[in-house]
Amino acid sequence: GALKDAISKKAAAADPSVGDIVLPTATVELDGKELSEADSAKAMLFAINKFSQTHGDFTISDLTDGYQSMLEDTRERIVAFKKTIAQGDFQAVFQPIVDIRTRALHHHEALVRFPETGADGSPYEMITFAEEAGVIGDFDIAMVKKVIATINAGKKVGKQVHAAVNLSGKSLESPLFIQTLLNILKDCRPIRNHLMFEVTESSRIDDLEAANKVLQELHKLGHHVCLDDFGAGAAAFQYLRALEVDFVKIDGIYVREAFTTPNGKIFLTSMASLCKELKIQTVGEFVETEEVARFLSQVGVTYGQGYLFGRPGGL
Protein backbone atom coordinates (compact mmCIF):
# COMPACT_ATOMS: atom_id res chain seq x y z
CA GLY A 1 0.00 0.00 0.00
CA ALA A 2 0.93 3.64 0.42
CA LEU A 3 3.20 2.88 3.37
CA LYS A 4 5.34 0.47 1.39
CA ASP A 5 5.50 2.89 -1.54
CA ALA A 6 6.71 5.67 0.74
CA ILE A 7 9.47 3.53 2.24
CA SER A 8 10.48 2.25 -1.20
CA LYS A 9 10.97 5.87 -2.27
CA LYS A 10 12.99 6.51 0.89
CA ALA A 11 15.25 3.56 0.13
CA ALA A 12 15.67 4.76 -3.45
CA ALA A 13 16.46 8.32 -2.37
CA ALA A 14 19.04 7.19 0.16
CA ASP A 15 20.55 4.45 -1.98
CA PRO A 16 23.46 5.75 -4.07
CA SER A 17 22.72 3.07 -6.67
CA VAL A 18 19.30 4.38 -7.65
CA GLY A 19 18.36 7.09 -10.09
CA ASP A 20 20.57 10.04 -11.02
CA ILE A 21 21.64 10.73 -7.43
CA VAL A 22 25.16 9.56 -6.63
CA LEU A 23 26.09 9.63 -2.95
CA PRO A 24 29.07 8.17 -1.08
CA THR A 25 28.98 4.39 -0.76
CA ALA A 26 26.85 3.22 2.15
CA THR A 27 28.86 2.05 5.13
CA VAL A 28 28.16 0.02 8.23
CA GLU A 29 29.80 0.14 11.63
CA LEU A 30 31.48 -3.19 12.31
CA ASP A 31 30.47 -3.10 15.95
CA GLY A 32 27.08 -4.25 14.71
CA LYS A 33 25.14 -1.22 15.96
CA GLU A 34 24.66 1.10 13.00
CA LEU A 35 23.31 0.92 9.46
CA SER A 36 23.44 3.54 6.75
CA GLU A 37 20.23 5.41 5.98
CA ALA A 38 19.86 3.47 2.75
CA ASP A 39 20.25 0.08 4.43
CA SER A 40 17.87 1.10 7.23
CA ALA A 41 15.25 1.89 4.60
CA LYS A 42 15.93 -1.47 2.94
CA ALA A 43 15.50 -3.21 6.29
CA MET A 44 12.16 -1.49 6.79
CA LEU A 45 10.97 -2.44 3.32
CA PHE A 46 12.06 -6.06 3.76
CA ALA A 47 10.34 -6.30 7.15
CA ILE A 48 7.14 -4.72 5.81
CA ASN A 49 7.05 -7.13 2.88
CA LYS A 50 7.50 -10.10 5.20
CA PHE A 51 4.99 -8.70 7.69
CA SER A 52 2.36 -8.10 5.00
CA GLN A 53 2.77 -11.65 3.71
CA THR A 54 1.48 -12.93 7.03
CA HIS A 55 -0.83 -10.06 8.05
CA GLY A 56 -2.20 -8.76 4.75
CA ASP A 57 -2.31 -5.05 3.90
CA PHE A 58 -1.94 -2.75 6.88
CA THR A 59 -1.51 0.85 7.99
CA ILE A 60 0.90 2.55 10.39
CA SER A 61 -1.52 1.87 13.24
CA ASP A 62 -1.16 -1.85 12.54
CA LEU A 63 2.59 -1.84 13.20
CA THR A 64 2.57 -3.90 16.36
CA ASP A 65 5.38 -5.32 18.43
CA GLY A 66 5.47 -8.24 15.98
CA TYR A 67 6.50 -5.93 13.15
CA GLN A 68 8.98 -4.04 15.33
CA SER A 69 10.60 -7.31 16.32
CA MET A 70 10.78 -8.37 12.68
CA LEU A 71 12.35 -5.04 11.73
CA GLU A 72 14.99 -5.30 14.44
CA ASP A 73 15.79 -8.86 13.39
CA THR A 74 16.14 -7.71 9.78
CA ARG A 75 18.45 -4.86 10.77
CA GLU A 76 20.62 -7.23 12.78
CA ARG A 77 20.81 -9.70 9.89
CA ILE A 78 21.82 -6.97 7.44
CA VAL A 79 24.50 -5.69 9.81
CA ALA A 80 25.84 -9.22 10.34
CA PHE A 81 25.85 -9.94 6.60
CA LYS A 82 27.64 -6.71 5.72
CA LYS A 83 30.15 -7.31 8.50
CA THR A 84 30.88 -10.78 7.12
CA ILE A 85 31.46 -9.31 3.66
CA ALA A 86 33.53 -6.35 4.88
CA GLN A 87 35.83 -8.64 6.87
CA GLY A 88 36.07 -11.22 4.08
CA ASP A 89 34.79 -13.85 6.48
CA PHE A 90 33.68 -16.27 3.77
CA GLN A 91 35.40 -18.84 1.60
CA ALA A 92 35.38 -19.32 -2.17
CA VAL A 93 35.34 -22.96 -3.25
CA PHE A 94 35.59 -24.16 -6.83
CA GLN A 95 33.71 -26.91 -8.67
CA PRO A 96 35.02 -28.17 -12.03
CA ILE A 97 33.02 -27.85 -15.24
CA VAL A 98 34.26 -30.26 -17.91
CA ASP A 99 33.75 -31.10 -21.56
CA ILE A 100 31.02 -33.72 -21.36
CA ARG A 101 32.67 -35.85 -24.08
CA THR A 102 36.41 -35.57 -23.46
CA ARG A 103 36.19 -34.83 -19.72
CA ALA A 104 38.78 -32.08 -20.20
CA LEU A 105 38.51 -29.27 -17.65
CA HIS A 106 36.98 -26.11 -19.12
CA HIS A 107 36.70 -23.90 -16.02
CA HIS A 108 35.55 -23.87 -12.40
CA GLU A 109 32.49 -22.26 -10.88
CA ALA A 110 33.29 -20.20 -7.80
CA LEU A 111 30.86 -20.99 -4.97
CA VAL A 112 30.65 -19.44 -1.53
CA ARG A 113 30.79 -21.03 1.89
CA PHE A 114 29.90 -19.03 5.01
CA PRO A 115 31.15 -19.93 8.51
CA GLU A 116 27.53 -20.14 9.72
CA THR A 117 26.71 -22.96 7.30
CA GLY A 118 29.89 -25.01 7.65
CA ALA A 119 32.24 -26.27 4.95
CA ASP A 120 29.57 -28.27 3.13
CA GLY A 121 26.54 -26.14 4.01
CA SER A 122 24.39 -24.43 1.42
CA PRO A 123 24.60 -20.62 1.27
CA TYR A 124 21.12 -20.49 -0.28
CA GLU A 125 19.32 -18.97 2.71
CA MET A 126 21.87 -16.19 3.24
CA ILE A 127 22.07 -15.32 -0.47
CA THR A 128 18.28 -15.28 -0.79
CA PHE A 129 18.01 -12.98 2.21
CA ALA A 130 20.67 -10.65 0.78
CA GLU A 131 18.78 -10.46 -2.52
CA GLU A 132 15.43 -9.80 -0.89
CA ALA A 133 16.91 -7.23 1.50
CA GLY A 134 18.73 -5.43 -1.32
CA VAL A 135 22.30 -5.94 -0.11
CA ILE A 136 23.46 -8.65 -2.51
CA GLY A 137 25.59 -6.22 -4.54
CA ASP A 138 28.14 -5.88 -1.74
CA PHE A 139 28.62 -9.63 -1.70
CA ASP A 140 28.86 -10.00 -5.48
CA ILE A 141 31.63 -7.39 -5.60
CA ALA A 142 33.49 -9.07 -2.72
CA MET A 143 33.25 -12.44 -4.46
CA VAL A 144 34.53 -11.00 -7.74
CA LYS A 145 37.54 -9.55 -5.92
CA LYS A 146 38.24 -12.86 -4.16
CA VAL A 147 38.13 -14.84 -7.40
CA ILE A 148 40.33 -12.33 -9.22
CA ALA A 149 42.87 -12.69 -6.40
CA THR A 150 42.74 -16.47 -6.81
CA ILE A 151 43.31 -16.23 -10.57
CA ASN A 152 46.22 -13.83 -10.08
CA ALA A 153 47.77 -16.04 -7.40
CA GLY A 154 47.63 -19.00 -9.76
CA LYS A 155 49.18 -16.96 -12.55
CA LYS A 156 52.17 -16.07 -10.36
CA VAL A 157 53.05 -19.77 -9.94
CA GLY A 158 52.31 -20.71 -13.55
CA LYS A 159 48.87 -22.15 -12.87
CA GLN A 160 46.10 -21.30 -15.32
CA VAL A 161 42.85 -20.74 -13.42
CA HIS A 162 39.63 -20.11 -15.34
CA ALA A 163 36.65 -19.37 -13.11
CA ALA A 164 33.04 -18.20 -13.29
CA VAL A 165 31.53 -15.88 -10.68
CA ASN A 166 27.81 -15.59 -9.99
CA LEU A 167 26.12 -12.20 -10.35
CA SER A 168 22.62 -11.71 -8.99
CA GLY A 169 20.01 -10.27 -11.32
CA LYS A 170 19.35 -7.75 -8.54
CA SER A 171 22.95 -6.55 -8.74
CA LEU A 172 22.63 -5.93 -12.47
CA GLU A 173 19.83 -3.44 -11.73
CA SER A 174 22.09 -1.24 -9.60
CA PRO A 175 24.03 1.49 -11.47
CA LEU A 176 26.46 1.79 -8.54
CA PHE A 177 27.16 -1.95 -8.63
CA ILE A 178 27.69 -1.89 -12.39
CA GLN A 179 30.10 1.04 -12.22
CA THR A 180 32.02 -0.57 -9.35
CA LEU A 181 32.28 -3.87 -11.23
CA LEU A 182 33.45 -2.24 -14.47
CA ASN A 183 36.04 -0.20 -12.59
CA ILE A 184 37.44 -3.39 -11.05
CA LEU A 185 37.52 -5.18 -14.40
CA LYS A 186 39.35 -2.33 -16.15
CA ASP A 187 42.40 -3.25 -14.07
CA CYS A 188 42.18 -6.94 -15.00
CA ARG A 189 43.29 -6.88 -18.63
CA PRO A 190 45.82 -9.77 -18.34
CA ILE A 191 43.23 -12.20 -16.94
CA ARG A 192 40.04 -11.17 -18.73
CA ASN A 193 39.78 -14.43 -20.66
CA HIS A 194 40.20 -16.29 -17.36
CA LEU A 195 37.15 -14.71 -15.69
CA MET A 196 33.56 -15.31 -16.73
CA PHE A 197 30.23 -14.50 -15.14
CA GLU A 198 27.05 -16.44 -14.41
CA VAL A 199 23.85 -14.42 -14.17
CA THR A 200 21.63 -16.16 -11.65
CA GLU A 201 17.91 -16.54 -12.21
CA SER A 202 17.11 -16.80 -8.49
CA SER A 203 16.00 -13.16 -8.45
CA ARG A 204 13.84 -11.77 -11.23
CA ILE A 205 15.36 -9.16 -13.53
CA ASP A 206 12.78 -6.45 -14.25
CA ASP A 207 14.68 -4.39 -16.83
CA LEU A 208 16.09 -6.93 -19.27
CA GLU A 209 17.18 -4.31 -21.77
CA ALA A 210 19.34 -2.56 -19.18
CA ALA A 211 20.72 -5.89 -17.95
CA ASN A 212 21.68 -6.87 -21.48
CA LYS A 213 23.61 -3.62 -21.88
CA VAL A 214 25.68 -4.64 -18.86
CA LEU A 215 26.35 -8.04 -20.41
CA GLN A 216 27.43 -6.33 -23.63
CA GLU A 217 29.91 -4.26 -21.62
CA LEU A 218 31.31 -7.46 -20.10
CA HIS A 219 31.63 -8.95 -23.58
CA LYS A 220 33.49 -5.86 -24.80
CA LEU A 221 35.99 -6.35 -21.99
CA GLY A 222 36.54 -9.96 -23.09
CA HIS A 223 34.48 -11.85 -20.51
CA HIS A 224 32.13 -14.70 -21.35
CA VAL A 225 28.66 -14.73 -19.78
CA CYS A 226 26.49 -17.66 -18.74
CA LEU A 227 22.77 -17.68 -17.89
CA ASP A 228 22.54 -19.77 -14.73
CA ASP A 229 19.63 -21.91 -13.50
CA PHE A 230 17.94 -21.92 -16.91
CA GLY A 231 14.39 -23.20 -16.54
CA ALA A 232 14.21 -22.62 -12.79
CA GLY A 233 12.03 -19.52 -13.10
CA ALA A 234 8.94 -18.64 -15.08
CA ALA A 235 10.84 -16.03 -17.11
CA ALA A 236 13.55 -18.41 -18.37
CA PHE A 237 12.72 -18.17 -22.07
CA GLN A 238 12.14 -14.43 -21.79
CA TYR A 239 15.68 -14.13 -20.41
CA LEU A 240 17.09 -16.29 -23.17
CA ARG A 241 15.44 -14.12 -25.80
CA ALA A 242 16.53 -10.82 -24.26
CA LEU A 243 20.02 -11.53 -22.88
CA GLU A 244 23.05 -12.10 -25.10
CA VAL A 245 24.93 -14.94 -23.42
CA ASP A 246 27.63 -17.41 -24.44
CA PHE A 247 26.55 -20.28 -22.20
CA VAL A 248 23.33 -21.55 -20.67
CA LYS A 249 23.43 -23.69 -17.54
CA ILE A 250 20.39 -25.95 -17.54
CA ASP A 251 18.93 -26.09 -14.05
CA GLY A 252 19.79 -29.33 -12.27
CA ILE A 253 16.14 -30.20 -11.63
CA TYR A 254 15.71 -30.91 -15.36
CA VAL A 255 18.73 -33.18 -15.37
CA ARG A 256 17.33 -35.17 -12.46
CA GLU A 257 13.81 -35.26 -13.87
CA ALA A 258 15.14 -36.71 -17.12
CA PHE A 259 15.47 -39.96 -15.19
CA THR A 260 12.53 -39.66 -12.81
CA THR A 261 9.56 -38.33 -14.82
CA PRO A 262 7.89 -39.56 -18.04
CA ASN A 263 8.56 -36.37 -20.02
CA GLY A 264 11.81 -35.39 -18.35
CA LYS A 265 14.08 -36.44 -21.20
CA ILE A 266 11.86 -34.64 -23.72
CA PHE A 267 12.14 -31.35 -21.85
CA LEU A 268 15.91 -31.64 -21.43
CA THR A 269 16.41 -32.62 -25.06
CA SER A 270 14.30 -29.65 -26.19
CA MET A 271 16.33 -27.22 -24.07
CA ALA A 272 19.62 -28.52 -25.43
CA SER A 273 18.30 -28.40 -29.01
CA LEU A 274 17.05 -24.82 -28.63
CA CYS A 275 20.39 -23.61 -27.30
CA LYS A 276 22.24 -25.40 -30.08
CA GLU A 277 20.06 -23.64 -32.67
CA LEU A 278 20.88 -20.33 -30.98
CA LYS A 279 24.59 -21.23 -31.04
CA ILE A 280 24.76 -21.09 -27.25
CA GLN A 281 26.87 -23.66 -25.42
CA THR A 282 25.18 -25.60 -22.62
CA VAL A 283 26.18 -26.85 -19.19
CA GLY A 284 24.29 -29.65 -17.45
CA GLU A 285 24.21 -29.57 -13.65
CA PHE A 286 23.91 -32.38 -11.09
CA VAL A 287 25.88 -34.91 -13.15
CA GLU A 288 26.41 -37.67 -10.63
CA THR A 289 26.53 -40.85 -12.73
CA GLU A 290 27.98 -42.04 -16.04
CA GLU A 291 24.44 -42.71 -17.24
CA VAL A 292 23.54 -39.05 -16.84
CA ALA A 293 26.78 -37.94 -18.52
CA ARG A 294 26.15 -40.21 -21.51
CA PHE A 295 22.61 -38.94 -21.95
CA LEU A 296 23.69 -35.29 -21.80
CA SER A 297 26.34 -36.00 -24.42
CA GLN A 298 23.79 -37.74 -26.65
CA VAL A 299 21.37 -34.79 -26.61
CA GLY A 300 24.10 -32.26 -27.36
CA VAL A 301 24.86 -30.70 -23.98
CA THR A 302 28.38 -29.28 -24.20
CA TYR A 303 29.66 -29.33 -20.63
CA GLY A 304 28.89 -31.06 -17.36
CA GLN A 305 29.09 -30.14 -13.69
CA GLY A 306 28.47 -32.43 -10.75
CA TYR A 307 29.93 -34.86 -8.26
CA LEU A 308 30.92 -37.26 -11.06
CA PHE A 309 33.56 -34.75 -12.11
CA GLY A 310 34.41 -33.26 -8.74
CA ARG A 311 33.01 -31.67 -5.60
CA PRO A 312 33.49 -28.01 -4.68
CA GLY A 313 36.86 -27.46 -3.05
CA GLY A 314 40.21 -25.76 -3.33
CA LEU A 315 42.25 -25.39 -6.49
Where on the chain are the PLM-derived regions?
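C-di-GMP signaling machinery
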Residues: E34-Q91, R101, F129-I136, G169-S171, ...
